[in-house]
Amino acid sequence: MATAVAAAGGGGGGEQPRRRKPAPGRGGVVLPAGLSEEEARVRAIAEIVSAMGELSRRGEDVDLNALKSAACRRYGLARAPKLVEMIAAVPEADRAALLPRLRAKPVRTASGIAVVAVMSKPHRCPHIATTGNICVYCPGGPDSDFEYSTQSYTGYEPTSMRAIRARYNPYVQARSRIDQLKRLGHSVDKVEFILMGGTFMSLPADYRDYFIRNLHDALSGHTSANVEEAVCYSEHGAVKCIGMTIETRPDYCLGPHLRQMLSYGCTRLEIGVQSTYEDVARDTNRGHTVAAVADCFCLAKDAGFKVVAHMMPDLPNVGVERDLESFREFFENPAFRADGLKIYPTLVIRGTGLYELWKTGRYRNYPPELLVDIVARILSMVPPWTRVYRVQRDIPMPLVTSGVEKGNLRELALARMEDLGLKCRDVRTREAGIQDIHHKIRPDEVELVRRDYAANEGWETFLSYEDTQQDILIGLLRLRKCGRNVTCPELVGRCSIVRELHVYGTAVPVHGRDADKLQHQGYGTLLMEEAERIARKEHRSKKIAVISGVGTRHYYRKLGYELEGPYMVKCLV
């Protein structure tokens, strides 16, 4: 054997040392001779991307998993290449064709925008000062077992962990999340911020200004001295802020608060309602009445904001029948009728007042199967103009003592609805982008649909372009004839307001165009023309206003609108 090795070495004379075989990877697969594991990985990624490009150019189907498996076997890789690694290796010429196949979590931008959630610093809930304590079910906050977390969060949710890593710096949170989405293959030309972490408007004004200023600066790249300057530069930035959502409470959603949020570029509010019963609000220590909820909905909508409510089934002393009746009232009573909904089934988490009730047997959650059934029945009640954003909290299951046992509650509820012959017709379920991703269905015959309803002392018109045969929603517009609660001087008098304009489908860059995508195909302009006709002919309004995201103001200027205060306004006479 030694002689054979020497001969193979090609040298003369003495015995040559044995050549060591390449180290096998996990599973016993041997790396190609002379390649380190890192070099083998780079070659495997290049081979996968090259094969994808070739198949795409020939118009053949691309089986990404098969290509990855073959490359891993050939190069003896212990771990398959990540999507982020493959996205970085795609040549510029092939990016348009290959990125949709490589995009991680495509649902992130299926609604046409990239959502960036950020958190303010930990602070105490404001109603401790008036009620002496927080809500009985609320975890987190500086006084809780999760002391470095914000109020109502544990610090272990994905958004919380990103915020903690950034030490709650708003600029770092926003910039790192945008860069992460970009690495995952998403278009981040259009960004919507969601401000989480408790009641933002209860924080000191100077901190709020610092936080908002840095969010806008993260998009524009400019270092601003104040919010007004930051908003101005953000309007012209390459990455557009098309909307901003702020979490608040009814007692921090009054006229002065609304005016301040408009100056920040805020377009949507998330308001904690939890229950439509006064006794439940009192027993759970909410610190406000249900009547206050109805009042703040009126004020918010008459200022043009979109309103998303948080509701909690399975609260103490409620029961199945009252829970279902509560949601029925929420959808049918004009005093509520929010534009969006987050359903948060009650969770028992250590350190809360509810945990103490659970320990002593004074509170028990619904059994898992019953909860799925209740959520299914709630989803069947949702009107077609309401969007269900979430169906459960993002709190990791190991931290939940009692309550929801599965992380896919929406999926289970939709399956139960199918068994019961029920259908969910909320906005999210019918969105074109969601339908394309989940069911590979694309709209065919598109028509304009109009729905009118009374809500919060005003006249609401929900305009949409839909494929009514397949029940697919392409775009929507929310138009309101304001009631008597107008607090903004720009809206006083005979004025109608567009509270939302949104065309669905995978995000397309602001100045881009893609014949295969639904955005930038003229649906938004058609919806605005119909809204102007209704405002002029039916509302008898003299002008129409739009609550516009800072980055979308140029779009409305092209349609003849001008900036007036925080709104884009057009005269109709």
Swiss-Prot record:
Family (UniProt): Belongs to the ELP3 family.
Species whose genome carries this gene: Oryza sativa subsp. japonica (Rice)
GO MF entries: 4 iron, 4 sulfur cluster binding; metal ion binding; tRNA binding; tRNA uridine(34) acetyltransferase activity
Gene3D superfamilies reported for this sequence: 3.40.630.30
Subunit organization: Component of the elongator complex.
Residues in Radical SAM core domain copies: 108-398
Role summary: Catalytic tRNA acetyltransferase subunit of the elongator complex which is required for multiple tRNA modifications, including mcm5U (5-methoxycarbonylmethyl uridine), mcm5s2U (5-methoxycarbonylmethyl-2-thiouridine), and ncm5U (5-carbamoylmethyl uridine). In the elongator complex, acts as a tRNA uridine(34) acetyltransferase by mediating formation of carboxymethyluridine in the wobble base at position 34 in tRNAs.
Region (Disordered): 1-31
Residues in the signal sequence: none
Pfam families named among the record's database cross-references: Acetyltransf_1, ELP3_N, Radical_SAM, Radical_SAM_C
Name this protein carries in UniProt: Elongator complex protein 3
